[in-house]
Every structure is written in structure tokens, then in C-alpha cells.
Amino acid sequence: MDRLKCPNFFKCRQKEKVTASSENFHVGENDENQERGNWSKKSDYLLSMVGYAVGLGNVWRFPYLTYTNGGGAFLIPYAIMLALAGLPLFFLECSLGQFASLGPVSVWRILPLFQGVGITMVLISVFVAIYYNVIIAYSLYYLFASFQSVLPWANCSSWADENCSRTPIVTGCNVSIGAGEMFMNISWVNTNNLTCLNGSEVFRPGQLPSEQYWDKVTLQRSSGMDETGVVVWYLALCLLLAWLIVGAALFKGIKSSGKVVYFTALFPYVVLLILLIRGATLEGASKGISYYIGAQSNFTKLREAEVWKDAATQIFYSLSVAWGGLVALSSYNKFNNNCYSDAIIVCLTNCLTSVFAGFAIFSILGHMAHISGKEVSQVVKSGFDLAFIAYPEALAQLPAGPFWSILFFFMLLTLGLDSQFASIETITTTFQDLFPKAMKRMRVPITLGCCLILFLLGLLCVTQAGIYWVHLIDHFCAGWGILIAAILEIAGIIWIYGGNRFIEDIEMMIGAKRWIFWLWWRACWFVITPILLSAILVWSLVKFHRPDYADIPYPDWGVALGWCMIIFCIIWIPIMAIIKIVQAEGNILQRIISCCRPASNWGPYLEKHRGERYRDMAEPAKETDHEIPTISGSTKPE
């Protein structure tokens, strides 16, 4: 690195003529695509994809699923579902975005009838971005709270009530009264200075200090969704800080976020390794790992359909397919990038990270069970309960607890941030494709404006009822909508556009392959993956249960609102299909057929990559084509 030179990230202002390239932060001098820009290095792309795929679910959901579904035996259906559902869809989306150099909405020039699928993906990313940054705000709050000599949730402090206890609480017992015995409640026994007879005590479970801290201090949780309460000001400030970090990382688009992910994507692995080494040295660690993936593995669980459904669902959501982000990030690749090897690398990294994280989590939970005299099954949790109750409780009981807490919550922060970067990049990429000239001039204000709007929408999630809203959005928007989009995506591209034609498109990028190479991909794309996704969707609908949080059921209007959110996301699929059909020419059948053909400006973005197959395609970057053009019998390539 040259000395005394401004880094590219903060490029020095010089008196020079402003060019289109200098106006567009996405574009560098050496980029192949001077309109949209490319990743500066392939490692920028790979780390961004790893950061997007590897998120909070790898740490707080996968280990719990493995434990509850047979331990090590769960890895068998997990690996099978990766091969049958996760990897095929992941490879398809990466190839799609890279081939056309377009984001999740404009890429549907491939099949204009299905443009609404892309809109659905972007809307789901918007909803998820709202609540995902709230989780990052929780992590920031706990990170700041950890900078104390004693962790605030280490003991039952002034905020706790009489239920706060690490040991079971005595509710009553038998006492000697005269010549006989009577069962009395413990408050009466204590008031009268009596002593319980040995073995007669009746216990009820207490609430851990970390649990009450989470409910009473962090969330100031209300009694239900009906009681919104006030905005929790310190969570609102943490949410603002989270959005400022996201905005700062994305102000130059992929050129800046591609550098930030070198830290946010790699640092979690350092922390997981440190936590694993520390956990492995603690008493009881081997017991925790045994429950996770060792001698306690139960292979008879493989006979249960629920285990296979959990494996497929975890793979599907963990890889972030059908959110639009994979298409958006891949659209900035150079045309001849080997997206096949990239898909393999990212998918395997994601799955191995999940397994690795489980060892770090369960080694320390095993120690927590050991010192509290409980079984591992009594301390293991999932989701928020693992991240903000069980694991903080375990860390509070370690020597130098604040240090380990700082490491853990900083890891959660970085895990969440790089996933959030990709979600926002999905939104800005959509604007980039629809309004390229405006984005060249106003990328920074548009990006910051997007962050500001999402921050304001997220304030509802940091009220005293905020956690209920977070769960509601997650339960509805991050579920069925994604499954529906994924099924239509693979059906539209493989069954309508044509799987063999799509394979020819891929070979234009990565080179021709022998027929046996595509045998597996054809089997998955044409048959196996759509069937699996459909089965998961049907299963999820059949097994639908009224959402609740902490055993508090959601009100009728809350459930109805959840359905309205998911309908709002997917309604654009039929709406855009109808619009395209109305705009087309001919009778109804001719209109539908014409809308199922690729648009005249579908194909490789740059002319030098089009070859004979796409030599007559219209120019994709023309301003008049910033939306998918109407398909009609009279449409001719320009």
C-alpha cells in the first residue's frame, strides 16, 4: 500500500472533470459493466454472499433444531435437503442475476408474466429489514450493557420481582401445628417463624435473572399486543445507530459494503472459535456436546416426517433463497464469473458454520447445566430465548463474564449486519435498475432515505409491545411468502422459460459442460426441488397455529394483520400478471402466450457477451426500457 495516500474508500477530491463513472459510486475504472458496476474483487462478492447466508439463524436456530431432532442424526436429512432443495435454488438465483446483470424485479424480463414474483421478493426483504435491524438493536443494547464490571443480569437487582431465582422457589410445605401437620403456604410459614418439615416442600420454577432482565429492562414488555405502550428510548437509539451503520456501509453501494464485509463476515468465525475453545475447557462441556451431536444422537428420529420438514425448512431459510438478495448481489458479477463454484462454496460454508456454531453454543450450555445441577434439556433454548436469556445467563456465571459477553454480542451484531447489508442492497438495486440515471446522481440520498424510512417504520418494534410485532412479521412475512415466490420462480424459469434454454444461458457464462454434469441439476430443477418446496408449503399451512410469544396468544386483529401483510406481499404476482396481459395484443390466449416469452431486452447486459443467441436483443440499459417492456405480436428488437 502506498504511503501518505488517501484510501479508495475516502477518495481525495481533485479538480477533474466529472464523468458518468465518477458520478456512479457503483462503478470503478476497471469494471466490466460501466453502467452498473462490478465487484472490485471476487472475494468481495463471496464474503458478501457468505455474510448474507450466514446469519443469526445459524447460531440460535440450527443448534436447537439439531438437538431436538436426534442430534447427529439430524445432519443426514440436513445434508440431503441441502443437495435436493437448497443448492439447486441457490445456484439458479446466482446464475439468473449474473447472466442478465439485473436485480430481482427487472430480471423478470425473462418471463414478464411473473414480474410480480420479483416484487414479492423485494417487499418481503423490506418487511424483514424492518424487524431484522431491531434484532441488531437488541444486540447493540446488550453489547453496551456488557461494559460493566458485573453484568447487569448476573443477579436479581432492583428491577426483579419475587419470582426471580436461579433455583426452584418454595410455595408451601407441611408444618407441625399442635399434635398434627398442616400444609401452609410459604409466606404464612415465614410470617409465623415456623420450619418446614423435611421433604414436604412444594416447588415452582423461578425465573432466571437474565429472563427478567430481558422482559423487564431490555424490552419493558407489555402484557400483550393490545398494549402498545411507549417507545423504549434506549432501544430506539440503538435502532438509530444500527441504521446509521447500515447507511454508512452502503453509501457507495457494493464498493463500500464489499470492503466492510471483510470484517463483518470473518469476525464471527474468530469469536465462535474463541467461544468454542473457552467452552471446551469448562466442566460439563462434554455433556452439552454429547446432547448436541454425540452419544445422545437418536437415529430413530429419522422415521418422523417432522424431522425432514425441519431440515428442509432450515436449509431453505438459512441460505436466504427467494428473498431477492442472491439475485441482486450476483448481478454485479462479471459475466464469465464461475457462479457454479461460488454457489457450492457459499452453501457448504453456510452449513459447516451452522454445525460449528452448535459446538460453541452447546459446550457453554453444558457447563451451565453442570453448575446449576440441571439436565442440558432444561437449559437449552432457541431463538431470542437462546441469544438473550440462556446464553447471557451462562456467560454471567463465567469468570470475566463481561469480556465473553462483549465478544458474543459483538458477534451477533456482525452476523446481523452483513445480512442486513444485502437486504438493503436488494432494495437499492431494484431502484438502480428501474431508475439508473437518478441512482447515478443521487445514490447517497436515496440509500440514506431508504434507511430513514425503514427506521421510522421500525419504531413500532421498539415500543413496549415491540417484540410481539417482531414475531408477527417473522411468522408471516418470512414464511409462506418466500415459499410461494420460490415455487413460482423455479416453475417459471424451468417449466415456462425452459430449463434447457436456461442451461444454455449458464453455459454462455461458465462454458459448455457434458450432459452428465447437468443430469443432477435437471432432476432437481424439473422435479425434485419444486415438489419439496410445495410439500413444505402445504405442510406449513396444514400445521398453522395461532402465533404467540411467551405463551401470550396474539389477538384476532393481530393475526388478521399478519395475513394482510403476507397478502400485500404476494398480491403483486396476480396484479402484475393481469397488467402484462392487458398491455399485450391479440386474444386472451395470444396475450398470455406473448407474456410468457422473454422480453425483447432480455439477455446479457453487455453486447460483447450476447453471441449469436442474443445478437438481436434490444439494449437493456435504454431509459425507455427501464421497466419490463410490453410483449406483443408487434414487438421487435431495437
Swiss-Prot record:
Top-level lineage group: Eukaryota
Gene encoding the protein: Slc6a14
Residue spans crossing the bilayer: 45-65, 72-92, 110-130, 231-251, 257-277, 311-331, 344-364, 395-415, 453-473, 476-496, 524-544, 559-579
Cell membrane is among the record's keywords: yes
Descriptive protein name: Sodium- and chloride-dependent neutral and basic amino acid transporter B(0+)
Entry function: Amino acid transporter that plays an important role in the absorption of amino acids in the intestinal tract. Mediates the uptake of a broad range of neutral and cationic amino acids (with the exception of proline) in a Na(+)/Cl(-)-dependent manner. Transports non-alpha-amino acids such as beta-alanine with low affinity, and has a higher affinity for dipolar and cationic amino acids such as leucine and lysine. Can also transport carnitine, butyrylcarnitine and propionylcarnitine coupled to the transmembrane gradients of Na(+) and Cl(-).
Taxonomic placement: Eukaryota, Metazoa, Chordata, Craniata, Vertebrata
A biological-process GO annotation: beta-alanine transport
Reactions it catalyzes: glycine(out) + chloride(out) + 2 Na(+)(out) = glycine(in) + chloride(in) + 2 Na(+)(in); L-leucine(out) + chloride(out) + 2 Na(+)(out) = L-leucine(in) + chloride(in) + 2 Na(+)(in); L-glutamine(out) + chloride(out) + 2 Na(+)(out) = L-glutamine(in) + chloride(in) + 2 Na(+)(in); L-arginine(out) + chloride(out) + 2 Na(+)(out) = L-arginine(in) + chloride(in) + 2 Na(+)(in)
Carbohydrate-modified residues: 155, 163, 174, 185, 193, 198, 298
